[in-house]
């Protein structure tokens, strides 16, 4: 029987740390580091991920002001949805973590596929096709520019 030893849970003197103590120590270490990013998630949006990704690629790694300008003047449906999610991420950064909105940029943006609604579409001669209405999950992370330097 093989033993599974986690090297990071062993102290300098060779003693193993209890799991609860290890997790508390890890949380304290993470809490001491300054938070430089904020996230916003929008799930089950009724838009095809393929169509939403084209707009998401245009604002990736852009400054917040530039990304908002691109989304504001775009006529696409995905731009309106991404605008709301980006505004939520900015609000999370300002209100929850005290970050300045002028120093933020879009560090990460993902559009994943959600569940599909399947509907029947009547066709000729008594047949039917399946119409798939796709959904998307959108994840946006904004980071502080000064923290990356």
From Swiss-Prot:
GO CC annotation, single: cytosolic large ribosomal subunit
Pfam family, any one: Ribosomal_L22
Coiled coil location: none
* Known partners and oligomeric status: Part of the 50S ribosomal subunit.
Q: Which species expresses this protein natively?
A: Petrotoga mobilis (strain DSM 10674 / SJ95)
Q: Which UniProt keywords apply?
A: Ribonucleoprotein, Ribosomal protein, RNA-binding, rRNA-binding
Q: What GO biological process term is on the record, naming one?
A: translation
- Gene from which this protein is expressed: rplV
Please verify whether the record's keywords include rRNA-binding. yes
Q: What does this protein do?
A: This protein binds specifically to 23S rRNA; its binding is stimulated by other ribosomal proteins, e.g. L4, L17, and L20. It is important during the early stages of 50S assembly. It makes multiple contacts with different domains of the 23S rRNA in the assembled 50S subunit and ribosome.
What protein family does this chain belong to?
Answer: Belongs to the universal ribosomal protein uL22 family.
Q: What is this protein called?
A: Large ribosomal subunit protein uL22
Q: Which SUPFAM superfamilies match?
A: Ribosomal protein L22
Q: What GO molecular function annotations does the UniProt record carry, in alphabetical order?
A: rRNA binding; structural constituent of ribosome
The organism's place on the tree of life at top rank: Bacteria
């Amino acid at each position: 029987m093989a033993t599974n030893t986690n090297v990071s849970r062993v102290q300098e003197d060779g003693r193993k740390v209890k799991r609860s103590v290890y997790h508390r120590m890890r949380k304290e270490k993470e809490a001491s580091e300054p938070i430089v990013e904020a996230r916003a998630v929008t799930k089950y949006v009724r838009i095809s991920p393929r169509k939403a990704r084209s707009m998401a690629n245009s604002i990736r790694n852009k400054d917040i002001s530039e990304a908002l300008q691109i989304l504001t003047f775009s006529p696409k449906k995905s731009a309106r949805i991404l605008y709301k999610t980006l505004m939520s991420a900015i609000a999370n950064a300002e209100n929850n973590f005290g970050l300045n909105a002028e120093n933020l940029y879009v560090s990460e943006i993902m559009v994943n596929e959600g569940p599909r609604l399947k509907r029947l579409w009547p066709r000729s001669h008594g047949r039917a096709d399946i119409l798939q209405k796709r959904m998307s999950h959108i994840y946006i992370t904004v980071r502080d520019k000064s923290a990356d330097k």
